[in-house]
Swiss-Prot record:
Keyword tags: Ribonucleoprotein, Ribosomal protein, RNA-binding, rRNA-binding
GO cellular-component term (any): cytosolic large ribosomal subunit
Highest rank taxon of the organism: Bacteria
Gene designation: rplO
Record-stated family: Belongs to the universal ribosomal protein uL15 family.
SUPFAM superfamilies referenced in this protein's UniProt entry, alphabetically: Ribosomal proteins L15p and L18e
A biological-process GO annotation: translation
Protein name in UniProt: Large ribosomal subunit protein uL15
Disulfide bonds: none
GO molecular function list: rRNA binding; structural constituent of ribosome
InterPro entries, alphabetized: Ribosomal_uL15 (IPR030878), Ribosomal_uL15/eL18 (IPR021131), Ribosomal_uL15/eL18_sf (IPR036227), Ribosomal_uL15_bac-type (IPR005749), Ribosomal_uL15_CS (IPR001196)
Keyword Membrane appears in the UniProt entry: no
Main function: Binds to the 23S rRNA.
The organism of origin for this protein: Frankia casuarinae (strain DSM 45818 / CECT 9043 / HFP020203 / CcI3)
PANTHER family for this protein: 50S RIBOSOMAL PROTEIN L15, LARGE RIBOSOMAL SUBUNIT PROTEIN UL15M
Amino acid sequence: MGTEAGSAPVVRGRGLKVHHLRPAPGAHKSKIRVGRGEGSKGKTAGRGTKGSKARKQVPARFEGGQMPLHMRLPKLKGFRNRFRVEYQVVNVATLAELFPQGGEVTKADLAARGAVRGKSPVKVLGNGDINVALHVSADAFSASAKEKIAAAGGSVTQS
Protein backbone atom coordinates (compact mmCIF):
# COMPACT_ATOMS: atom_id res chain seq x y z
CA MET A 1 0.00 0.00 0.00
CA GLY A 2 1.46 3.37 -1.02
CA THR A 3 0.49 6.92 -1.86
CA GLU A 4 1.17 8.99 -4.92
CA ALA A 5 1.76 12.75 -4.78
CA GLY A 6 -1.43 14.67 -3.87
CA SER A 7 -3.91 11.79 -4.15
CA ALA A 8 -5.70 9.19 -2.07
CA PRO A 9 -3.83 6.09 -0.91
CA VAL A 10 -3.50 3.43 -3.60
CA VAL A 11 -3.90 -0.20 -2.60
CA ARG A 12 -1.51 -2.34 -4.63
CA GLY A 13 -2.65 -5.77 -5.76
CA ARG A 14 -6.07 -5.72 -4.09
CA GLY A 15 -7.97 -3.29 -6.35
CA LEU A 16 -9.75 -0.04 -5.55
CA LYS A 17 -12.22 -0.07 -2.67
CA VAL A 18 -14.93 2.43 -1.80
CA HIS A 19 -13.57 3.10 1.68
CA HIS A 20 -10.23 4.21 0.17
CA LEU A 21 -11.83 6.99 -1.91
CA ARG A 22 -11.28 10.58 -0.78
CA PRO A 23 -12.29 13.94 -2.25
CA ALA A 24 -9.59 15.84 -4.11
CA PRO A 25 -7.62 18.31 -1.97
CA GLY A 26 -9.46 21.65 -1.82
CA ALA A 27 -12.72 20.17 -3.15
CA HIS A 28 -14.56 20.71 0.14
CA LYS A 29 -14.30 24.18 1.65
CA SER A 30 -15.46 24.51 5.23
CA LYS A 31 -18.48 26.75 5.88
CA ILE A 32 -17.67 30.25 7.20
CA ARG A 33 -19.06 30.60 10.72
CA VAL A 34 -20.10 34.22 11.19
CA GLY A 35 -20.57 36.22 14.37
CA ARG A 36 -18.14 34.19 16.53
CA GLY A 37 -15.65 36.55 18.12
CA GLU A 38 -13.79 39.69 17.05
CA GLY A 39 -12.08 38.50 13.86
CA SER A 40 -13.23 38.75 10.26
CA LYS A 41 -17.00 38.16 10.02
CA GLY A 42 -17.27 38.67 13.79
CA LYS A 43 -19.49 41.11 15.72
CA THR A 44 -21.85 42.35 12.94
CA ALA A 45 -21.13 39.26 10.80
CA GLY A 46 -20.72 41.19 7.55
CA ARG A 47 -24.18 42.80 7.77
CA GLY A 48 -23.09 46.38 8.46
CA THR A 49 -24.73 48.33 11.27
CA LYS A 50 -28.37 48.71 12.25
CA GLY A 51 -31.45 48.65 10.03
CA SER A 52 -33.77 45.86 8.94
CA LYS A 53 -31.06 44.20 6.82
CA ALA A 54 -28.82 43.90 9.87
CA ARG A 55 -31.53 42.63 12.22
CA LYS A 56 -33.27 40.01 10.14
CA GLN A 57 -33.67 38.71 6.61
CA VAL A 58 -35.32 40.94 4.00
CA PRO A 59 -38.10 38.95 2.22
CA ALA A 60 -36.99 37.40 -1.09
CA ARG A 61 -39.91 39.09 -2.87
CA PHE A 62 -38.89 42.58 -1.69
CA GLU A 63 -37.78 44.79 -4.59
CA GLY A 64 -36.31 47.72 -2.67
CA GLY A 65 -39.46 49.89 -2.61
CA GLN A 66 -40.21 49.44 -6.32
CA MET A 67 -43.80 48.40 -7.10
CA PRO A 68 -43.75 44.60 -6.70
CA LEU A 69 -44.23 42.35 -9.70
CA HIS A 70 -47.45 40.81 -8.38
CA MET A 71 -48.98 44.30 -8.17
CA ARG A 72 -47.67 45.41 -11.58
CA LEU A 73 -49.37 42.53 -13.41
CA PRO A 74 -53.09 42.81 -14.26
CA LYS A 75 -55.65 40.75 -12.36
CA LEU A 76 -56.93 37.64 -14.09
CA LYS A 77 -60.56 37.99 -15.08
CA GLY A 78 -63.24 35.33 -15.02
CA PHE A 79 -62.88 31.81 -13.70
CA ARG A 80 -62.40 28.26 -14.88
CA ASN A 81 -65.34 25.91 -14.38
CA ARG A 82 -64.03 22.77 -12.66
CA PHE A 83 -67.09 20.76 -13.70
CA ARG A 84 -67.03 21.56 -17.44
CA VAL A 85 -67.31 18.47 -19.64
CA GLU A 86 -64.65 18.58 -22.37
CA TYR A 87 -65.76 16.52 -25.39
CA GLN A 88 -63.55 14.93 -28.01
CA VAL A 89 -64.95 15.95 -31.38
CA VAL A 90 -65.57 13.70 -34.39
CA ASN A 91 -67.22 14.99 -37.56
CA VAL A 92 -69.60 12.97 -39.75
CA ALA A 93 -67.12 13.28 -42.65
CA THR A 94 -64.52 11.49 -40.49
CA LEU A 95 -67.04 8.75 -39.67
CA ALA A 96 -67.74 8.27 -43.39
CA GLU A 97 -63.97 7.97 -44.07
CA LEU A 98 -63.28 5.55 -41.23
CA PHE A 99 -66.33 3.31 -41.83
CA PRO A 100 -66.98 3.29 -45.63
CA GLN A 101 -68.88 -0.03 -45.41
CA GLY A 102 -71.35 1.37 -42.82
CA GLY A 103 -72.57 -0.55 -39.80
CA GLU A 104 -72.32 -0.12 -36.02
CA VAL A 105 -69.97 2.57 -34.62
CA THR A 106 -69.12 2.77 -30.90
CA LYS A 107 -66.59 4.75 -28.86
CA ALA A 108 -64.39 1.65 -28.72
CA ASP A 109 -64.41 1.42 -32.54
CA LEU A 110 -63.44 5.10 -32.82
CA ALA A 111 -60.60 4.62 -30.33
CA ALA A 112 -59.37 1.53 -32.21
CA ARG A 113 -59.18 3.53 -35.45
CA GLY A 114 -57.38 6.46 -33.74
CA ALA A 115 -60.21 9.01 -34.07
CA VAL A 116 -60.50 9.53 -30.28
CA ARG A 117 -58.48 8.71 -27.17
CA GLY A 118 -59.21 6.95 -23.93
CA LYS A 119 -62.13 7.59 -21.67
CA SER A 120 -63.08 11.21 -22.45
CA PRO A 121 -66.63 11.73 -23.74
CA VAL A 122 -67.19 11.91 -27.51
CA LYS A 123 -69.39 14.38 -29.41
CA VAL A 124 -70.30 13.92 -33.08
CA LEU A 125 -70.56 17.14 -35.10
CA GLY A 126 -72.14 17.65 -38.50
CA ASN A 127 -69.19 18.98 -40.50
CA GLY A 128 -68.90 17.34 -43.93
CA ASP A 129 -71.08 14.86 -45.82
CA ILE A 130 -72.03 11.27 -45.08
CA ASN A 131 -73.48 8.78 -47.57
CA VAL A 132 -73.26 5.46 -45.67
CA ALA A 133 -75.78 4.11 -43.16
CA LEU A 134 -74.10 4.22 -39.75
CA HIS A 135 -75.60 3.32 -36.38
CA VAL A 136 -73.56 5.64 -34.15
CA SER A 137 -73.31 5.44 -30.36
CA ALA A 138 -71.66 8.46 -28.64
CA ASP A 139 -72.03 10.74 -25.61
CA ALA A 140 -73.44 13.75 -27.50
CA PHE A 141 -74.53 14.81 -31.00
CA SER A 142 -75.10 18.16 -32.65
CA ALA A 143 -78.49 18.70 -34.30
CA SER A 144 -76.92 18.81 -37.79
CA ALA A 145 -75.04 15.53 -37.14
CA LYS A 146 -78.28 13.79 -36.12
CA GLU A 147 -80.00 15.06 -39.29
CA LYS A 148 -77.18 13.96 -41.62
CA ILE A 149 -76.81 10.49 -40.07
CA ALA A 150 -80.60 9.93 -40.22
CA ALA A 151 -80.77 11.23 -43.82
CA ALA A 152 -78.08 8.70 -44.84
CA GLY A 153 -80.21 5.87 -43.40
CA GLY A 154 -78.40 5.48 -40.09
CA SER A 155 -79.41 5.94 -36.47
CA VAL A 156 -78.14 7.77 -33.38
CA THR A 157 -77.82 6.37 -29.85
CA GLN A 158 -76.80 8.69 -27.03
CA SER A 159 -74.86 6.78 -24.37
